[in-house]
Curated annotation (Swiss-Prot):
Keyword Cell division (UniProt): yes
HAMAP family recorded: MinC
Keyword Cell cycle found: yes
InterPro entries per the UniProt record, alphabetical: CAP/MinC_C, MinC, MinC_C_sf, MinC_N, Septum_form_inhib_MinC_C
Gene Ontology biological process terms from the UniProt entry: cell morphogenesis; division septum assembly; regulation of cell division; regulation of cell septum assembly
Protein task: Cell division inhibitor that blocks the formation of polar Z ring septums. Rapidly oscillates between the poles of the cell to destabilize FtsZ filaments that have formed before they mature into polar Z rings. Prevents FtsZ polymerization.
SUPFAM superfamilies membership: Cell-division inhibitor MinC, C-terminal domain
NCBIfam families assigned: minC (TIGR01222)
PANTHER family listed in its UniProt record: SEPTUM SITE-DETERMINING PROTEIN MINC (PTHR34108:SF1)
Quaternary structure (record): Interacts with MinD and FtsZ.
Residues that span the membrane, as ranges: none
Species annotation: Baumannia cicadellinicola subsp. Homalodisca coagulata
Keyword list, A-Z: Cell cycle, Cell division, Septation
This protein's name: Probable septum site-determining protein MinC
Amino acid sequence: MIHAPIDFKGSNFTLLVIHIYDAPIEVIIQAIQDKITQAPQLLKNAPVILNVASLSPECNWINLLKAILSTGLHVVAVSGCNNSTLKNDIIISGLPLITEGQTLQCSSYTTTPIKSTLSINNKTKLIHTPIRSGQQIYAKNSDLVITNNVSAGAELIADGNIHIYGMMRGRALAGASGDSHCQIFCSYLFPELVSIAGQYWIDDQIPAELLGKAGRIYLHCDALSIQPLIF
């Protein structure tokens, strides 16, 4: 049987969305570089989407894009553009325009999570094997339970809650569809990043006294909070 040379298939990827606001280019670039310095494992050479909803149509898009690319980030698409002039500039630069509805699976730097019409059901994705560096596990419309260790460089994503009953050294993103009621439960906290509905902490934002201990991470008043747990 002869196979076709290509095949189109749907898949899910987690991308960071950077919301660009009106500011001098050098200020924007410095802010991006500061973020990369804070979380190099997550952001260095990372693929990102730029949201330009708050960007002035009078901006010099080509110069701004060149400056952003100079930081090492790889811009894969642009969202939030409602101005015809800016749209034309973006198209000329060779980047695709996408709508917010297409970016619901993306983690975001905004303080307001994207709201989704998806409802989390009672299904649970259960994994007993170790999660290795470079692996990505996605629990669509469900909770995710890991009963083993998660290595640095691994990524856990769930539209529901995430439970890790092992050493957690990777990234955990709960409420990936925008559900702010989701939580992360972990037996041994050493994560590179934790996120709930787009709100995130990198490793050095987690209280030092809770590292290596059990904790529950949740959203309170649109900000991440952590509560020690005793098993």
